[in-house]
Curated annotation (Swiss-Prot):
Belongs to the class-II aminoacyl-tRNA synthetase family. This is Alanine--tRNA ligase. Its EC number is 6.1.1.7. It comes from Streptococcus suis (strain 05ZYH33). PROSITE patterns: AA_TRNA_LIGASE_II_ALA (PS50860). Transmembrane segments: none annotated. InterPro entries: aa-tRNA-synth_II/BPL/LPL, Ala-tRNA-lgiase_IIc, Ala-tRNA-ligase_IIc_anticod-bd, Ala-tRNA-synth_IIc_core, Ala-tRNA-synth_IIc_N, Ala-tRNA_ligase, Ala_tRNA_ligase_euk/bac, DHHA1_dom. The lineage of its organism: Bacteria, Bacillati, Bacillota, Bacilli, Lactobacillales.
Length: 872
C-alpha cells in the first residue's frame, strides 16, 4: 500500500476531482460569515449551504474542497481516543443538481482503488448503506464489491431539520485483526460497535429529498435538483496511509508532540498513557487556526471555546511538568506542518503567538484568583453552617478558573468539606448538551425555492444612475411566476435597474416604479439578489403591472446619498483601525444605513478612549483633505497587485470593483460611494462596545447626523454647567473635579469615624479576657451589620496580644453568625467551631487559625458563650 504524506493525500484528492470537472473551492474561514446558526465552520459542506438550498447558483455545479473545520461538542474525549479532534480537515466533493448516485459511487471507488490514485486493496474496503436504498447496493455490486462487504444500516439516512436529505453510503477501511483483540469481526460494523478495526474514511450523502418534519419520511418530496455531499477525514486517511496506530502518530500531529517532548523533558510512548501529549497537540492546532482566522479567547461564544481549549491544554502541560507558558512556542510548528495549503498560520504567527502567550499568562493569574474564590466560597459555606460544596460551584471553578475536580477536592478536604459530585456532573452534562444542540441547530440547509432558482432572465445593475427606463422581465407573486399583478406584494426583475441590491453591508435602495404617464404603480421596499444573481425588487403595488412593459425606476436619492456617505466613511474607518490598533483589526461585519454606520472588527480588548480619539481624528483628516473616491473595474489579480483589501468570506468573481481613496484606502467593494471624501462632511463615533468574544463594534454617524450628535452633547454640557453653577462651559471640568474632591474628602472622613467607632467597640470587647485551663480567651456577643464586620474585629484582635482565643457571636437578621480565631497551637479554630455551632442550630468549619459558622437559634447565644470555657 502507498505511503503518502498528509499534503500528498490532500493534493491527490483535489487533483482527482479536478479531473472529473470539479472546481476547487478554497478553504473558508473557520468563523462563519453571514451564518448566525453556526458557531464554527464544522464540515466541508457548511460553507456551501447557499448552493444546496438554492439561494445562490454556483458557476460550476461540481465542487471539491479541503475545508478546515472545528467541532467542540466532545472536548472531554480529545486525547482519550485515537480519532477525536477539535480541529480537523474534511475533504469533500459536491454536486449541485448535476451528477448523482451512479457517478458519485463509481468515481469514489475509482479514487480509492485505482493504482493511479489511492490504490487501497479492494478487499480492505467495506460499505454500509440504507436498507431501502437498493440502487446504491446494486451500484457497489456492479463495481465488483463482494456482497459480504456491504452492510445495511437503518442509521444511514442523513437529515437534520427541514431541507435537503437522503440516504448515505459510508466507506470503511479494515485495519485487520491486530485492531480487533476480541476477534469480533464484521459484527463491529453490523451492530455499530465502537472499534479501531473498521475505520470510517468517507461518507457519501445522496441528497434527493426535501425533508419536512411534519410528514413521514416516505412522503418527503423529491428535490428539483438532486445533490451529492461527501466528506472524508484527512486525519484518518493519513493514519491509514502512514501505518499509524492513531491519528496522533501521523505527520499532522507528531511534529507537535516532538516539540512538547523537548519542552517537557518527557517521552511520548505510543503504547502508554499519552493523553496530555495528544490534548496539547490537538488543541494548539485549533487555537492557531481559529485565532489566525480572527476568533479570540473570551468568556462567551467561540471565544469561550478557545479559552477552554487553551486552559485544558495548559493544565495538561502542568501534568507533564511544564510550569511556564509554552503553548505559544508550538504555533510555528503548526504553521510549518500546514504551510503548503494553509500559509495563513505562518503569515500571522507573531499575532497568534502574542494572543496565546497572553492567555497563558492570564490563566496563571486566574488560577491564583480561583484559589481566592474557592477560599471565600468555603468561608461563606462555613458561615452558613454548610459543609458540602454545591456542584454548580465546583463546575464554575472547573469551567471559569480551570480547576480540575481533584484540585477542588484537595482544598475542600483541608477545610473538612465534601463535594457534590452528582451536581457537578449534571452541570457538565448541561453544558455538553448545549454544545451539541448548537451543532444540530446549524445543520439544516433550508428548503429549496424552485421558483426563484428557475429565474434565468438577465438583469443589470447600472452604477451611477438614480432613474432609468427598464423592461419588466419577471413577476413572482405568491411564490409563482405570473404575467401580471395588480395588488399586494410581488417580486420583480427588470432587464436593468438603478436599485442597489443589499450586499456587502450596504442596505438596499428604496424608491418607486412609474408607468408611462408618470404615475406610481409600485413602491420598492427591498432589493435582494436572486439565486442566479439578478436584483430582485420587493414591491407594494398600487396599480396593475405586466411583464414586457417598460417602466421608469426611480430611487430615493436622499437615502442613497446618506448610505454612500456612511459606506465611504466605513472604508476610512477600516483603514484608520489598521493604522492605529493593528492589522489584525479586520472587518467582521458592517451595516451602512442612511443615518448611521455600524462596523464590527476583530480585536482582543476594548479600544481605549485615546485610540478612539485618534481614529476619529484620522478619519476626519481624510474627509477634510477632500480626496477623490475612484472606482475601477479590473480582474482579481490586478486588484491584488494594487494592494486591494479583500474581505474574508466575500466571494469575488474574475472581474471586481476596486474603490481607492487616494493612497489611504484600497478595497474590493461592489457598493456605491461618494465622489469625494469632502461630501461626508464630518465623522463622529457614538459608541464602541464588545459584541462577542474577540469582536468589537463601532457605531458612528456622518454629515447632518454627526452635527446633531455634537449639538446634543453641547446641550447636555450646558445643562451640567447650569446645575453646578458654572457660567463658563470651559470651567465645567474643573468645577466637577472640585466637587468630586469634596465628596472624596467627606467619604474619607466618614470612613475614619466608622473606623474610630469600630476600634472603640473592639476595645470594649477585648477588655473582657477570661482564662480556662491556662488559655486566655475572649467570648462576646457584638452588634454588627454583616459577617464581614466580624472578620474586621478578628483582624484588629490579631494586631495585639489580647488573648489566645477569640469567640464572637452576632445576631444578624434571623441568622446567627459565629467566628472563632486562635493564636494557640493547642486550639484548632475549625475544630472548636464544629463543637460550638450546633448550640445555635448551625454548622461550620475552617482553618486552625480562623473559622466561621452560621446558625438559626439566637436564643442560645448566651449558652454558646458560656460553653466556650468547657471546650478549651
Amino acid at each position: 500500500m502507498k505511503n503518502l504524506s498528509s499534503a500528498q493525500i490532500r493534493q491527490m484528492w483535489l487533483d482527482f476531482w479536478k479531473s472529473k470537472g470539479h472546481s476547487v473551492e478554497p478553504s473558508a474561514n473557520l468563523v462563519p460569515v453571514n451564518d448566525p446558526t453556526l458557531l464554527w465552520i464544522n464540515s466541508g459542506v457548511a460553507t456551501l449551504k447557499k448552493y444546496f438550498d438554492g439561494s445562490v447558483i454556483p458557476d460550476n455545479p461540481r465542487i471539491t474542497n479541503a475545508q478546515k473545520s472545528i467541532r467542540t461538542n466532545d472536548i472531554e474525549n480529545v486525547g482519550k481516543t485515537a480519532r477525536h479532534h477539535t480541529m480537523f480537515e474534511m475533504l469533500g466533493n459536491f454536486s449541485i443538481g448535476d451528477y448523482f448516485r451512479d457517478e458519485a459511487i463509481e468515481w469514489g471507488f475509482e479514487l480509492l482503488t485505482s493504482p493511479e490514485w489511492f490504490a487501497f486493496p479492494k478487499d480492505k474496503l467495506y460499505m454500509t448503506y440504507y436498507p431501502d436504498d437498493m440502487d446504491s447496493y446494486n451500484r457497489w455490486i456492479a463495481l465488483g464489491v463482494e456482497p459480504s462487504h456491504l452492510i445495511p444500516l437503518e442509521d444511514n439516512f442523513w437529515e437534520i431539520g427541514a431541507g435537503p436529505s437522503g440516504p448515505d453510503t459510508e466507506i470503511f477501511f479494515d485495519r485487520g485483526t491486530d485492531f480487533d483483540p476480541e476477534n469480533i469481526g464484521i459484527r463491529l460494523l453490523e451492530e455499530d460497535i465502537e472499534n479501531d478495526r473498521y475505520i470510517e474514511i468517507w461518507n457519501i450523502v445522496l441528497s434527493q429529498f426535501n425533508a419536512d418534519p411534519a410528514v413521514p419520511r416516505s412522503e418527503y418530496k423529491e428535490l428539483p435538483n438532486k445533490n451529492i455531499d461527501t466528506g472524508a477525514g484527512l486525519e484518518r486517511l493519513a493514519a491509514i496511509f502512514q501505518g499509524a496506530k492513531t491519528n496522533f502518530e501521523t505527520d499532522l500531529f507528531l511534529p507537535i508532540i516532538r516539540e512538547v517532548e523537548k519542552i517537557s523533558g518527557k517521552t511520548y510512548d505510543q503504547d502508554g498513557d499519552n493523553m496530555s501529549f495528544k490534548v496539547i497537540a490537538d488543541h494548539i492546532r485549533a487555537l492557531s487556526f481559529a485565532i489566525g482566522d480572527g476568533a479570540l479567547p473570551g468568556n462567551e461564544g467561540r471565544g469561550y471555546v478557545l479559552r477552554r481549549l487553551l486552559r485544558r491544554a495548559s493544565m495538561h502541560g502542568q501534568r507533564l511538568g511544564i510550569t511556564e507558558p509554552f503553548l505559544y512556542k508550538l504555533v510555528e510548528t503548526v504553521g510549518n506542518i500546514m504551510e503548503s495549503y494553509y500559509p495563513e498560520v505562518l503569515e500571522k504567527r507573531a499575532f497568534i503567538e502574542k494572543i496565546v502567550k497572553s492567555e497563558e499568562e492570564s490563566f496563571a493569574r486566574t488560577i491564583h484568583t480561583g484559589s481566592q474564590f474557592a477560599e471565600q466560597l468555603m468561608d461563606k459555606l462555613a458561615a452558613e453552617g454548610k459543609s458540602e460544596i454545591d456542584g454548580r460551584d465546583i463546575f464554575k471553578l472547573y469551567d471559569t478558573y480551570g480547576f480540575q475536580v481533584e484540585l477542588t477536592e484537595e482544598l475542600a478536604e483541608h477545610r473538612g468539606m465534601t463535594l457534590d459530585i452528582a451536581g457537578f456532573e449534571a452541570a457538565m452534562k448541561e453544558q455538553q448538551d448545549r454544545a451539541r444542540a448548537s451543532v444540530v441547530k446549524g445543520g439544516s440547509m433550508g428548503m429549496q425555492n424552485e421558483t426563484l432558482a428557475a429565474i434565468t432572465e438577465e438583469s443589470t445593475f447600472v452604477y451611477g444612475q438614480t432613474a432609468l427606463e427598464a423592461s419588466l422581465s419577471v413577476i413572482v407573486a405568491d411564490n409563482a411566476r405570473t404575467e401580471a399583478v395588480s395588488e399586494g406584494q410581488a417580486l420583480l426583475v427588470f432587464d436593468q435597474t438603478p436599485f442597489y441590491a443589499e450586499m456587502g453591508g450596504q442596505v438596499a435602495d428604496h424608491g418607486f416604479v412609474k408607468n408611462a404617464t408618470g404615475d406610481i404603480v409600485a413602491t420598492v421596499i427591498d432589493v435582494q439578489k436572486a439565486p442566479n444573481g439578478q436584483p430582485l425588487h420587493t414591491v407594494e403595488l398600487s396599480a396593475s403591472i405586466s411583464v414586457g412593459q417598460t417602466y421608469t425606476l426611480e430611487i430615493e436619492t436622499k437615502r442613497r446619498k446618506g448610505v454612500e456617505k456612511n459606506h465611504t466613511a466605513t472604508h476610512l474607518l477600516h483603514a484608520a483601525l489598521h493604522n492605529i490598533i493593528g492589522e489584525h483589526a479586520t472587518q467582521a461585519g458592517s451595516l451602512n444605513e442612511q443615518d448611521f454606520l455600524r462596523f464590527d472588527f476583530t480585536h482582543f480588548e476594548a479600544v481605549t478612549a485615546e485610540e478612539l480619539r485618534r481614529i476619529e481624528e484620522e478619519v476626519n483628516e481624510q474627509i477634510w483633505n477632500a480626496i477623490p473616491v475612484v472606482t475601477v473595474e479590473t480582474d482579481i489579480d490586478t486588484a491584488k497587485e494594487m494592494g486591494a483589501m479583500a474581505l474574508f468570506g466575500e466571494k469575488y468573481g474574475k472581474e471586481v470593483r476596486v474603490v481607492t481613496i487616494g493612497d489611504y484606502s484600497v478595497e474590493l467593494c461592489g457598493g456605491t460611494h461618494v465622489g469625494n471624501t469632502a461630501e461626508i462632511g464630518i465623522f463622529k463615533i457614538l459608541k464602541e462596545e464588545g459584541i462577542g468574544s474577540g469582536t468589537r463594534r463601532i457605531i458612528a454617524v456622518t454629515g447632518r447626523e454627526a452635527f446633531l450628535a455634537y449639538r446634543d452633547q453641547e446641550d447636555a454640557l450646558k445643562e451640567v454647567a447650569a446645575t453646578i453653577k458654572s457660567p463658563q462651559i470651559k470651567e465645567v471640568p474643573n468645577k466637577v473635579e472640585s466637587l468630586a474632591q469634596q465628596v472624596r474628602d467627606l467619604q474619607k472622613e466618614n470612613a475614619a469615624l466608622k473606623e474610630k467607632a469600630a476600634a472603640a467597640a473592639a476595645g470594649d470587647v477585648f477588655k473582657n479576657v477570661k482564662d480556662a485551663n491556662g488559655i486566655r480567651y475572649i467570648a462576646s456577643q457584638v452588634q454588627v451589620s454583616d459577617a464581614g464586620a466580624l472578620r474586621t474585629f478578628a483582624d484588629n484582635w490579631k494586631q495585639k496580644d489580647y488573648s489566645d482565643v477569640l469567640v464572637l457571636v452576632a445576631a444578624i437578621g434571623d441568622k446567627v453568625n459565629v467566628l472563632v480565631a486562635s493564636k494557640s497551637s493547642d486550639v484548632h479554630a475549625g475544630n472548636l467551631i464544629k463543637v460550638l455551632a450546633p448550640i445555635v442550630a448551625g454548622r461550620g468549619g475552617g482553618k486552625p487559625d480562623m473559622a466561621m459558622a452560621g446558625g438559626s437559634d439566637a436564643s442560645a447565644i448566651q449558652t454558646l458563650l458560656n460553653s466556650v470555657a468547657d471546650n478549651l
